[in-house]
Swiss-Prot record:
GO terms for molecular function: N-acyltransferase activity. GO terms for cellular component: membrane. It comes from Pseudomonas fluorescens (strain Pf0-1). This is UDP-3-O-acylglucosamine N-acyltransferase. InterPro entries: Hexapep, Hexapep_transf_CS, LpxD, Trimer_LpxA-like_sf, UDP_GlcNAc_AcTrfase_non-rep. NCBIfam families: lipid_A_lpxD, PRK00892.1. The active site is at residue 240.
Length: 351
């Protein structure tokens, strides 16, 4: 389905200042390099300014400073990237689900499904589950016993919710995600691992997004908790009892060990790992591949990953790391010897 919106309508939608033809028809979005004569683009990152003069876009989202030297159609906004985010939903080709229950769905007698919800083929909804208004369940989703999905939720095909998973409003969960799987809990008895029942659940706040193949384990006793507005990328592992504060975002392949607490408005880049039973305060940024081994009490950016080098240089650096203990001992010896020399450069009476 092709959407056509006039440039003037987009300006009104954004509250933007229009420079150019308000009747210009816009049919889609594209990058500066690839946009055609009916598509809207944007300039948010200065490194792409070099493409501004040659773009074929019908119109651009620009800051005022960039719009001054641009002769084409423009929507002038304070933040072009944020404006692009808002407009993107107007051109989203994702099919809209229709209300109703597919005849192949299996629904427990005491489950409650709002009439406005869309339940796709081969969905399973177990006893005591509750599905809110305008919820979409894609094909082959499983909603476990006593689990709840708040209004406006959207679950892609093959999402699995175990029992006692509570999901807030307007939550988006992508395919393959598993919420409420048993946490990794075992007690050691003379070298043999004894399983610990995971009797907590999972609680997800409002406006959360959960990526493809991400796993959020149920709590051992209390719930694993994901706050409002949290954004989780693909292939993230969140262990039992973890708590994630509101509006924290995590990129792919983050791993969080059990009982760790992460504050509000944090950002975790790809491949970050956290040990268990630590606390991360609000407004912390962890760069890619950082390994967090203790609590963080001060906001700011933290790193521990090794930056990329040419392979030959990296091998030399790795070899030097193995020599650090010896270098440290030699440095201490030099410091001791230098301390035995008097200020005038002569050896002390102690020789």
């Amino acid at each position: 389905m092709t959407v056509t919106i006039k440039l003037g309508q987009l300006a009104e939608f954004l509250g933007a200042t229009l420079s150019g033809d308000p009747e210009k028809q816009i049919t889609g979005l594209a990058t500066l390099q690839e946009a055609g004569p009916a598509q809207l683009s944007f300039l948010a990152n200065p490194q792409y300014r070099k493409y501004l003069a040659g773009t074929q876009a019908a119109a651009l989202l620009l800051k005022a400073a960039d719009a001054e030297g641009y002769a084409g159609n423009a929507l002038v906004v304070p933040d072009p990237y944020l404006a692009y985010a808002r407009i993107s939903h107007l051109f989203d080709p994702k099919p809209k689900a229709t209300a109703g229950i597919h005849p192949t769905a299996v629904i427990a007698e005491d489950a409650v499904v709002d009439p406005s919800a869309s339940v796709g083929p081969f969905v399973v909804i177990e006893a005591g589950a509750r599905i809110g208004a305008d919820v979409t369940l894609g094909a082959h989703c499983v909603v476990g016993a006593r689990s709840e999905i708040g209004e406006g939720g959207w679950l892609a095909p093959r999402v699995t919710l175990y029992h006692d998973v509570r999901i807030g409003k307007r939550v988006v969960i992508q395919s393959g995600a598993v919420l409420g799987g048993e946490g990794f809990g075992f007690a050691n008895e003379k070298g043999v691992w004894q399983k610990i029942a995971q009797i907590g659940g999972v609680t997800i706040g409002d406006d959360v997004e959960i990526g493809v193949n991400t796993a959020i384990d149920r709590g051992a006793l209390a719930d694993t908790v994901i706050g409002n507005g949290v954004k989780l990328d693909n292939q993230i592992q969140i262990a039992h009892n973890v708590q994630v504060g509101d509006h924290t975002a995590m990129a792919a392949c983050v791993g969080i060990s059990g009982s760790t607490k992460i504050g509000k408005h944090c950002m975790l880049a790809g491949g970050v790992g956290l040990v268990g039973h630590i606390d991360i305060c609000d407004n912390v940024f962890l760069t890619g591949m950082t390994m967090v081994t203790h609590s963080i009490t001060e906001p700011g950016a933290y790193s521990s990953g090794t930056a990329m080098q040419p392979a030959a240089e990296w091998r030399k650096s790795a070899a030097r790391i193995r020599q650090l203990d010896d270098i440290a001992r030699r440095l201490k010896q030099l410091e001791k010897r230098s301390g035995e020399v008097t200020p005038d450069g002569n050896a002390s009476s102690e020789g």
